[in-house]
């Protein structure tokens, strides 16, 4: 496949969710993404191109940021169906078509679960915490009204775009071996690290906010050291965080 068509496919994949329907979900976006490469693979054979388009117009639904792995893997498998002469191998065409359909179906579910957990439940809240923390640390003024949304947009979209590109590259390079590579990724461990980091950022922002006022400086320092000691003693970081919140609210009423 030509590099220009591969690049076009990648940029088209950004529009995967531009057209939704409740019957087949992301099927229109999927077919739109791979169409440039399908046209190159099948050339002037309009009948086989039409059959391929109908085949990929079937149900498809996964996490949009990790869908690129399935898209590039599908293109590799479609390309392998074509003999050196440029015509599909009739003997193996039906078998490979079923293999492609099966891989799309069996990969879409697990990848959707990984993406939902990693991006919706971890990355997005973490970037929101960073943006909110920026307000508490830097204060609210006319400049920060514009900077805070930019902090969130950049902190979220850098990993998001990276995973789109990296997943697309993995599918092109490793084909069906990408399944084994993805299974070896420690998504659960990384998600847990992000969760803990997010709570630490919340604690840090809370302490900095308290210390910004002379009246609450002592409380800020005290809460920081208490949090550090409790975490060192393996107390749940979530309990530490909510303890800090309740403590701050109580201190506010007392003072």
Task: Place the predicted regions along the sequence by residue.
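Central hydrophobic cores of alpha-helical transmembrane segments
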Residues: 220-224, 239-248
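Helix-coil boundary and interhelical linker segments in multi-pass alpha-helical membrane proteins
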Residues: 132-149, 210-211, 255
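Alpha-helical transmembrane segments
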Residues: 144-160
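Transmembrane alpha-helical segments and their cytosolic interface motifs
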Residues: 97-134, 197-201
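Soluble N-terminal domains of membrane-associated systems
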Residues: 1-89
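Juxtamembrane inter-helical linkers in multi-pass membrane proteins
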Residues: 90, 94, 169-187
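Juxtamembrane boundary at the C-terminal end of a transmembrane helix
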Residues: 248-255
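Alpha-helical transmembrane segments of helical membrane proteins, especially in multi-pass transport
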Residues: 160-168, 183-212
């Amino acid at each position: 496949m030509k590099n220009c068509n591969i690049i076009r496919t990648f940029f088209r994949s950004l529009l995967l969710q531009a057209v939704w329907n409740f019957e087949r979900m992301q099927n229109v976006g999927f077919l739109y993404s791979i169409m440039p490469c399908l046209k190159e693979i099948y050339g002037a054979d309009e009948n086989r191109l039409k059959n391929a388009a109908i085949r990929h117009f079937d149900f498809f639904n996964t996490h949009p940021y990790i869908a690129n792995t399935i898209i590039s893997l599908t293109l590799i498998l479609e390309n392998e169906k074509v003999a050196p002469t440029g015509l599909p191998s009739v003997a193996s065409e039906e078998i490979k078509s079923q293999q492609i359909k099966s891989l799309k179906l069996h990969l879409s579910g697990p990848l959707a679960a990984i993406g939902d957990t990693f991006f919706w439940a971890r990355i997005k809240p973490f970037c929101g915490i960073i943006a909110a923390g920026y307000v508490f640390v830097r204060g609210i003024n006319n400049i920060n009204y514009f900077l805070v949304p930019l902090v969130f947009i950049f902190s979220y979209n850098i990993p998001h775009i990276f995973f789109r590109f990296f997943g697309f590259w993995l599918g092109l390079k490793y084909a069906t071996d990408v399944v084994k590579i993805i299974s070896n990724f420690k998504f659960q461990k990384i998600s847990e690290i992000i969760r803990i980091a997010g709570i630490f950022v919340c604690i840090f922002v809370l302490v900095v906010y308290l210390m910004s006022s002379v009246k609450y400086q002592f409380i800020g320092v005290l809460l920081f050291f208490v949090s550090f000691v409790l975490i060192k003693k393996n107390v749940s970081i979530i309990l530490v965080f909510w303890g800090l919140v309740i403590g701050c609210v109580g201190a506010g009423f007392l003072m």
